[in-house]
């Protein structure tokens, strides 16, 4: 069975944490296809700061050394806000016989009940939750705990060989980097070079982004 991983985010900007997390995931799971999915206008997050075109360009630059990582722009190509359930339905229509795995952070899992038609997500894809030990101190909503009790399975072969319906928690390493923090540091003219791929850093400086 062909296995597909989908890593969604605003990538505003894409940073070394995104890349290192993805490399760790692939080293452990080895999905046949791995897509970075830039969101257009997330329904439960503020609007992005860079344009869609700029965010895609930064992704292209960041992924140049990693030809196995692809970019999927279907959310940007839609005229409607980014609802993950619609995106996964689109993937499922295109890849009817593949396993689909959506990669989310542990915070994303806790906020899952806020997602539009969130109950349908597990029927469309598996969930690979990037967990970190410090997050386990946060209270888990009852609806999410019920979901974990029913669908959690940390056997990686399940994700690779089942169309949907499993939740796997995986520690991909701790990287104290966030796009929000990088934007704030750039606005304060602080050095962020070590947190960004070189080509992305050069692009941000050239475009004078996040000033």
UniProtKB/Swiss-Prot annotation:
This protein's record includes keyword Membrane: no
Catalytic activity field: nicotinate beta-D-ribonucleotide + ATP + H(+) = deamido-NAD(+) + diphosphate
Example GO biological process: NAD biosynthetic process
EC number: 2.7.7.18
UniProt KW keywords: ATP-binding, NAD, Nucleotide-binding, Nucleotidyltransferase, Pyridine nucleotide biosynthesis, Transferase
Molecular-function GO term, any one: ATP binding
Listed InterPro entries: Cyt_trans-like, NadD/NMNAT, Rossmann-like_a/b/a_fold
Pathway info: Cofactor biosynthesis; NAD(+) biosynthesis; deamido-NAD(+) from nicotinate D-ribonucleotide: step 1/1
Function statement: Catalyzes the reversible adenylation of nicotinate mononucleotide (NaMN) to nicotinic acid adenine dinucleotide (NaAD).
PANTHER family xrefs: NICOTINATE-NUCLEOTIDE ADENYLYLTRANSFERASE-RELATED, PHOSPHOPANTETHEINE ADENYLYLTRANSFERASE
Family as reported in the entry's similarity comment: Belongs to the NadD family.
Protein's name according to its UniProt entry: Probable nicotinate-nucleotide adenylyltransferase
Name of the encoding gene: nadD
